[in-house]
């Protein structure tokens, strides 16, 4: 079921993406993003740029798991082995989000203004639906899958606002989400080993046998909710400040509500899976995994704390990325300059 949904939705998204690319190429004669930045802005007013921009939003939004086309992600991410799920959660949706940010800030900067209302409500709906879906699930791996969906909404919220502070927050959140999503899926795999399954109702008392796993899961979950001083706190602060300054109160409300729901969710899972006593006569917990898995989870958990406690380097890096997104002139000049040099150096073809 998960494979069918994943394959169908991604095939459909790729089809829409190719249509958008073909239309854009037909009007501009180029696919270089640096070249497109100038040529799209020079197109006449009657050119269907808004339609093409919405096609990009639809296709890349499907790949990023934006609401209402997010349902493939929880169906697909909980089925592979934990290591594969961790890689999927860390990278795949982030590629879609990164592509949306690059395309809309470089090729369609004016369309960001036009599509702002659509992006705002899609982002808010993705945050809330993801968090509510996680609360409603009974399988811990599906729960974490829905938190990935909610995080995608937070990232797109920064694009919808469009300011430098908002893009800084989105970039920082991408880095945070890569770390935490991978860690939580690895923790879910270790929980399945220790407890013999991933159904929350069947799990109990794992703290006694796996205190390291319990602490790592709790810290990564709190980071996901945006609790200081962990890594998830700072990007949400930047996004909330940017939303208040821009009057994007829907995005601010979505971030705060989804964060509160995530905090409730992590507290419920920790209480049921780790803290409550196992029923009398239940088998003892098995090993929660090998040294490599524990080492990887420990490293990601420490990284989550370090990035939160010493956020200045990541904030600086994210800030530079945001500034370049809003002022892409140097990037365009470098790319087009290299293209012109390559063209002049190309050997002449003689008959």
PLM regions: where:
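Hydrophobic transmembrane alpha-helices and their helix-loop junctions in integral membrane proteins
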Residues: 1-228, 234-237, 241-263, 267
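Cytoplasmic/organellar membrane-interface segments at the starts of transmembrane helices
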Residues: 80, 200-201, 207-215, 268-351
């Amino acid at each position: 079921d998960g494979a069918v949904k994943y394959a169908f939705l991604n095939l459909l998204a790729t089809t829409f993406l190719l249509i958008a690319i073909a239309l854009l190429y037909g009007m501009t004669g180029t696919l270089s993003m640096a070249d497109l930045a100038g040529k799209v802005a020079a197109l006449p007013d009657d050119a269907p740029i808004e339609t093409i921009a919405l096609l990009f939003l639809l296709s890349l939004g499907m790949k990023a798991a934006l609401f209402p086309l997010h349902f493939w992600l929880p169906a697909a991410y909980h089925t592979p082995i934990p290591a594969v799920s961790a890689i999927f959660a860390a990278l795949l949706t982030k590629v879609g989000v990164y592509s949306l940010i690059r395309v809309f800030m470089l090729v369609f900067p004016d369309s960001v203004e036009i599509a702002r209302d659509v992006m705002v409500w899609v982002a808010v709906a993705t945050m809330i639906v993801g968090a509510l879906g996680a609360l409603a699930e009974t399988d811990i791996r599906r729960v974490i899958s829905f938190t990935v969906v909610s995080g995608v909404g937070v990232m797109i919220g920064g694009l919808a606002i469009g300011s430098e502070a908002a893009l800084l927050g989105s970039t920082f959140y991408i880095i945070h989400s890569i770390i935490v999503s991978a860690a939580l899926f690895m923790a879910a795999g270790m929980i399945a080993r220790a407890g013999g399954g991933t159904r929350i109702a069947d799990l109990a008392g794992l703290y006694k046998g796996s205190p390291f796993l319990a602490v790592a899961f709790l810290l990564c979950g709190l980071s996901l909710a945006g609790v200081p001083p962990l890594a998830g706190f700072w990007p949400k602060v930047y996004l909330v400040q940017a939303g208040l300054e821009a009057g994007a109160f829907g995005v601010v409300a979505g971030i705060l509500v989804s964060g509160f729901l995530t905090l409730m969710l992590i507290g419920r899972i920790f209480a049921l899976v780790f803290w409550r006593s196992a029923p009398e006569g239940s088998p003892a917990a098995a090993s929660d995994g090998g040294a490599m898995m524990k080492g990887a989870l420990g490293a990601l958990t420490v990284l989550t704390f370090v990035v939160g406690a010493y956020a200045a380097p990541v904030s600086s890096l994210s800030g530079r990325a945001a500034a370049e997104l809003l002022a892409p002139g140097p990037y365009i000049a470098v790319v087009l300059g290299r293209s012109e040099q390559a063209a002049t150096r190309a050997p002449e073809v003689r008959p």
